[in-house]
Protein backbone atom coordinates (compact mmCIF):
# COMPACT_ATOMS: atom_id res chain seq x y z
CA UNK A 1 0.00 0.00 0.00
CA UNK A 2 1.33 3.45 -0.87
CA UNK A 3 2.38 5.70 2.01
CA UNK A 4 2.10 8.80 -0.18
CA UNK A 5 -0.59 10.71 1.73
CA UNK A 6 -2.26 14.05 1.20
CA UNK A 7 0.08 15.50 3.83
CA UNK A 8 3.11 14.18 1.92
CA UNK A 9 1.74 15.73 -1.25
CA UNK A 10 1.22 19.12 0.39
CA UNK A 11 4.71 19.04 1.91
CA UNK A 12 6.22 18.24 -1.49
CA UNK A 13 4.30 21.07 -3.13
CA UNK A 14 5.39 23.51 -0.42
CA UNK A 15 9.06 22.61 -0.77
CA UNK A 16 8.92 22.72 -4.56
CA UNK A 17 7.16 26.07 -4.42
CA UNK A 18 9.84 27.50 -2.16
CA UNK A 19 12.55 26.17 -4.46
CA UNK A 20 10.88 27.78 -7.47
CA UNK A 21 11.45 31.22 -5.94
CA UNK A 22 15.21 30.69 -5.82
CA UNK A 23 17.60 31.95 -8.52
CA UNK A 24 18.37 29.55 -11.41
CA UNK A 25 21.89 28.73 -10.19
CA UNK A 26 20.55 27.71 -6.78
CA UNK A 27 17.82 25.57 -8.33
CA UNK A 28 20.38 23.86 -10.58
CA UNK A 29 22.64 23.11 -7.61
CA UNK A 30 19.70 21.69 -5.66
CA UNK A 31 18.46 19.53 -8.50
CA UNK A 32 21.64 17.44 -8.57
CA UNK A 33 20.80 15.53 -5.39
CA UNK A 34 17.16 16.38 -4.76
CA UNK A 35 15.59 19.51 -3.34
CA UNK A 36 17.45 19.61 -0.06
CA UNK A 37 20.32 17.12 -0.21
CA UNK A 38 22.01 15.87 2.92
CA UNK A 39 25.39 17.22 3.87
CA UNK A 40 28.28 15.80 1.87
CA UNK A 41 31.03 13.60 3.14
CA UNK A 42 34.36 15.19 3.93
CA UNK A 43 36.06 16.11 0.65
CA UNK A 44 39.54 14.71 1.27
CA UNK A 45 42.83 15.37 -0.47
CA UNK A 46 46.39 14.84 0.71
CA UNK A 47 47.20 18.21 -0.89
CA UNK A 48 44.55 20.22 0.97
CA UNK A 49 45.91 22.95 3.25
CA UNK A 50 43.19 24.62 5.31
CA UNK A 51 43.54 27.14 8.12
CA UNK A 52 40.68 28.50 10.22
CA UNK A 53 40.43 31.05 13.00
CA UNK A 54 37.60 31.75 15.40
CA UNK A 55 37.49 35.49 14.72
CA UNK A 56 38.98 38.63 16.29
CA UNK A 57 42.23 38.15 14.39
CA UNK A 58 43.50 41.73 14.77
CA UNK A 59 44.84 43.88 17.60
CA UNK A 60 45.92 47.52 17.45
CA UNK A 61 45.35 47.68 13.70
CA UNK A 62 47.46 44.63 12.84
CA UNK A 63 46.99 40.89 12.67
CA UNK A 64 47.72 39.32 16.05
CA UNK A 65 51.14 37.73 16.47
CA UNK A 66 49.59 34.24 16.46
CA UNK A 67 47.71 34.93 13.23
CA UNK A 68 50.76 36.48 11.55
CA UNK A 69 52.84 33.43 12.43
CA UNK A 70 50.10 31.14 11.14
CA UNK A 71 49.85 33.12 7.88
CA UNK A 72 53.59 32.78 7.34
CA UNK A 73 53.41 29.04 7.95
CA UNK A 74 50.25 28.53 5.92
CA UNK A 75 50.80 30.71 2.87
CA UNK A 76 54.54 30.10 2.58
CA UNK A 77 55.95 31.81 -0.50
CA UNK A 78 52.49 32.65 -1.89
CA UNK A 79 52.07 36.41 -1.64
CA UNK A 80 48.86 37.09 -3.60
CA UNK A 81 45.67 36.52 -1.61
CA UNK A 82 42.20 36.37 -3.14
CA UNK A 83 39.72 37.73 -0.61
CA UNK A 84 36.24 36.19 -0.53
CA UNK A 85 34.06 38.73 1.30
CA UNK A 86 30.58 37.43 0.48
CA UNK A 87 29.74 37.25 4.20
CA UNK A 88 29.83 41.05 4.29
CA UNK A 89 26.78 43.03 3.20
CA UNK A 90 27.35 44.10 -0.43
CA UNK A 91 27.61 47.85 0.26
CA UNK A 92 30.33 47.24 2.87
CA UNK A 93 32.61 44.98 0.82
CA UNK A 94 34.76 47.76 -0.64
CA UNK A 95 35.50 49.11 2.84
CA UNK A 96 36.28 45.65 4.20
CA UNK A 97 38.57 45.00 1.26
CA UNK A 98 40.56 48.18 1.97
CA UNK A 99 41.00 47.22 5.64
CA UNK A 100 42.21 43.74 4.74
CA UNK A 101 44.50 45.01 1.98
CA UNK A 102 46.28 47.19 4.55
CA UNK A 103 46.49 44.38 7.09
CA UNK A 104 47.96 41.96 4.57
CA UNK A 105 50.27 44.63 3.11
CA UNK A 106 51.88 45.02 6.54
CA UNK A 107 53.11 41.46 6.09
CA UNK A 108 54.08 41.90 2.42
CA UNK A 109 51.01 40.24 0.91
CA UNK A 110 48.96 41.60 -1.99
CA UNK A 111 45.21 41.16 -1.58
CA UNK A 112 42.21 41.79 -3.82
CA UNK A 113 38.55 40.91 -3.38
CA UNK A 114 36.60 38.52 -5.57
CA UNK A 115 33.48 40.70 -5.38
CA UNK A 116 34.80 42.91 -8.19
CA UNK A 117 34.18 40.06 -10.66
CA UNK A 118 31.01 38.15 -11.51
CA UNK A 119 30.01 35.08 -13.51
CA UNK A 120 32.71 33.38 -15.54
CA UNK A 121 35.22 36.14 -14.78
CA UNK A 122 34.91 35.42 -11.07
CA UNK A 123 35.40 31.70 -11.71
CA UNK A 124 38.55 32.52 -13.71
CA UNK A 125 39.90 34.51 -10.74
CA UNK A 126 39.30 31.50 -8.50
CA UNK A 127 40.96 29.17 -11.01
CA UNK A 128 44.07 31.37 -11.04
CA UNK A 129 44.24 32.16 -7.32
CA UNK A 130 47.44 31.51 -5.36
CA UNK A 131 45.67 31.48 -1.99
CA UNK A 132 42.31 32.31 -0.40
CA UNK A 133 41.15 34.30 2.59
CA UNK A 134 37.42 33.92 3.33
CA UNK A 135 36.25 36.62 5.70
CA UNK A 136 33.69 36.74 8.48
CA UNK A 137 30.21 38.17 8.73
CA UNK A 138 26.93 36.49 7.81
CA UNK A 139 27.46 32.75 7.32
CA UNK A 140 24.15 32.13 5.57
CA UNK A 141 24.75 34.99 3.12
CA UNK A 142 28.24 33.63 2.43
CA UNK A 143 27.05 30.08 1.77
CA UNK A 144 24.10 31.15 -0.37
CA UNK A 145 26.31 33.41 -2.50
CA UNK A 146 28.92 30.68 -2.97
CA UNK A 147 26.24 28.24 -4.13
CA UNK A 148 24.31 30.74 -6.25
CA UNK A 149 27.42 31.84 -8.16
CA UNK A 150 28.89 28.36 -8.61
CA UNK A 151 31.94 29.46 -6.62
CA UNK A 152 31.58 26.88 -3.83
CA UNK A 153 32.57 23.98 -6.05
CA UNK A 154 35.26 26.05 -7.78
CA UNK A 155 36.92 26.97 -4.48
CA UNK A 156 36.65 23.41 -3.19
CA UNK A 157 38.34 22.12 -6.36
CA UNK A 158 41.25 24.55 -5.96
CA UNK A 159 41.70 23.74 -2.27
CA UNK A 160 41.75 20.01 -2.98
CA UNK A 161 44.41 20.74 -5.61
CA UNK A 162 46.63 22.39 -2.99
CA UNK A 163 45.71 26.10 -2.98
CA UNK A 164 45.80 27.28 0.66
CA UNK A 165 42.42 28.17 2.22
CA UNK A 166 42.24 30.52 5.18
CA UNK A 167 38.89 31.30 6.80
CA UNK A 168 37.90 33.50 9.72
CA UNK A 169 34.58 33.22 11.59
CA UNK A 170 31.97 32.70 8.82
CA UNK A 171 34.86 31.71 6.54
CA UNK A 172 35.69 29.01 9.08
CA UNK A 173 32.09 27.82 9.22
CA UNK A 174 31.91 27.09 5.49
CA UNK A 175 35.19 25.14 5.52
CA UNK A 176 33.45 22.41 7.52
CA UNK A 177 30.97 19.80 6.33
CA UNK A 178 27.80 21.73 7.21
CA UNK A 179 27.02 25.13 8.76
CA UNK A 180 25.44 23.44 11.76
CA UNK A 181 26.91 25.45 14.66
CA UNK A 182 26.94 29.04 13.46
CA UNK A 183 26.43 31.83 15.97
CA UNK A 184 24.73 34.21 13.52
CA UNK A 185 21.13 34.48 12.36
CA UNK A 186 19.90 32.83 9.12
CA UNK A 187 19.54 36.23 7.42
CA UNK A 188 18.88 34.60 4.03
CA UNK A 189 17.62 31.17 3.01
CA UNK A 190 20.04 28.49 1.85
CA UNK A 191 19.11 25.36 -0.11
CA UNK A 192 21.28 23.15 2.10
CA UNK A 193 23.52 23.42 5.15
CA UNK A 194 26.20 21.51 3.23
CA UNK A 195 29.28 23.65 2.71
CA UNK A 196 32.77 23.38 1.21
CA UNK A 197 33.59 20.34 3.33
CA UNK A 198 37.40 20.49 3.29
CA UNK A 199 37.50 20.01 7.07
CA UNK A 200 35.89 16.83 8.47
CA UNK A 201 34.01 18.63 11.25
CA UNK A 202 31.35 21.22 12.00
CA UNK A 203 32.90 24.51 13.14
CA UNK A 204 31.74 26.72 16.00
CA UNK A 205 33.72 30.01 15.89
CA UNK A 206 34.03 32.55 18.72
CA UNK A 207 33.93 29.72 21.27
CA UNK A 208 34.37 31.19 24.77
CA UNK A 209 37.38 30.09 26.81
CA UNK A 210 36.92 28.02 29.96
CA UNK A 211 35.73 30.25 32.77
CA UNK A 212 34.15 32.90 30.54
CA UNK A 213 30.57 33.88 31.51
CA UNK A 214 29.10 32.38 28.33
CA UNK A 215 31.23 29.23 28.28
CA UNK A 216 28.70 26.90 29.96
CA UNK A 217 25.86 28.06 27.72
CA UNK A 218 27.91 27.49 24.55
CA UNK A 219 28.86 24.00 25.75
CA UNK A 220 25.18 23.26 26.46
CA UNK A 221 24.07 24.40 22.99
CA UNK A 222 26.69 22.38 21.15
CA UNK A 223 25.90 19.23 23.14
CA UNK A 224 22.20 19.73 22.38
CA UNK A 225 23.07 20.02 18.69
CA UNK A 226 25.02 16.76 18.85
CA UNK A 227 22.15 14.90 20.51
CA UNK A 228 20.13 15.66 17.38
CA UNK A 229 23.09 15.11 15.02
CA UNK A 230 25.02 12.29 16.73
CA UNK A 231 27.18 11.39 13.73
CA UNK A 232 28.79 14.83 13.62
CA UNK A 233 31.86 16.19 15.39
CA UNK A 234 32.18 19.85 16.35
CA UNK A 235 35.37 21.89 16.63
CA UNK A 236 34.86 24.94 18.83
CA UNK A 237 37.49 27.56 18.12
CA UNK A 238 37.94 30.73 20.14
CA UNK A 239 38.66 34.31 19.18
CA UNK A 240 42.26 34.61 18.04
CA UNK A 241 42.64 30.83 17.92
CA UNK A 242 43.96 29.01 14.85
CA UNK A 243 43.59 25.41 13.64
CA UNK A 244 45.17 23.97 10.51
CA UNK A 245 44.86 20.94 8.25
CA UNK A 246 48.05 20.22 6.33
CA UNK A 247 49.42 17.01 4.82
CA UNK A 248 46.54 15.05 6.33
CA UNK A 249 47.13 16.22 9.90
CA UNK A 250 45.16 18.73 11.96
CA UNK A 251 47.01 20.89 14.45
CA UNK A 252 45.93 23.55 16.90
CA UNK A 253 48.34 26.39 16.19
CA UNK A 254 46.90 28.65 18.89
CA UNK A 255 44.09 28.08 21.38
CA UNK A 256 41.52 27.98 22.79
CA UNK A 257 39.94 25.09 20.88
CA UNK A 258 37.48 22.39 21.92
CA UNK A 259 36.55 18.94 20.58
CA UNK A 260 32.93 17.78 20.83
CA UNK A 261 31.53 14.39 19.89
CA UNK A 262 28.48 12.76 21.47
CA UNK A 263 28.50 13.70 25.14
CA UNK A 264 32.27 14.20 25.13
CA UNK A 265 33.90 17.61 25.29
CA UNK A 266 37.67 18.12 25.46
CA UNK A 267 39.81 21.25 25.59
CA UNK A 268 42.48 20.75 22.94
CA UNK A 269 46.13 21.61 23.62
CA UNK A 270 48.29 23.26 21.00
CA UNK A 271 50.06 20.90 18.63
CA UNK A 272 48.92 17.81 16.74
CA UNK A 273 45.28 16.89 17.40
CA UNK A 274 44.89 13.08 17.20
CA UNK A 275 41.09 13.20 17.62
CA UNK A 276 40.61 15.41 14.56
CA UNK A 277 43.42 13.87 12.52
CA UNK A 278 41.73 10.48 12.94
CA UNK A 279 38.72 11.91 11.10
CA UNK A 280 40.94 12.89 8.18
CA UNK A 281 42.52 9.46 7.93
CA UNK A 282 39.38 7.42 8.64
CA UNK A 283 38.07 5.47 5.66
CA UNK A 284 35.07 7.05 3.90
Annotate the PLM regions.
Residues 2-3, 8-29:
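N-terminal export signals
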Residues 34-76, 84, 93-98, 131, ...:
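C-terminal and late-domain segments of enzyme folds
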Residues 52, 113-115, 134, 166-168, ...:
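General beta-strand structural signal in soluble alpha/beta enzymes
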Residues 89-137, 141:
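Portal/gating segments that form or line small-molecule/metal binding sites
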Residues 133-136, 159-178:
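Catalytic nucleophile loop
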Residues 139-149:
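Glycine/threonine-rich flexible loop motifs
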Residues 149-162:
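Catalytic-core regions built around general acid/base machinery
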Amino acid sequence: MSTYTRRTFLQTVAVAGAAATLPPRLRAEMSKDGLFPAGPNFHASARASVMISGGTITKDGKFTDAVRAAHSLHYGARKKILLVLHATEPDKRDADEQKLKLLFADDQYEAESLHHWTGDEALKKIAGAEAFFVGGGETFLLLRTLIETGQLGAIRERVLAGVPYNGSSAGSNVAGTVIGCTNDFPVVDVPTRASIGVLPVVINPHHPPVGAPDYAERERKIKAYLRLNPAETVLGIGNGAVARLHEGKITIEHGPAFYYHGAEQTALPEGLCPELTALVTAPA
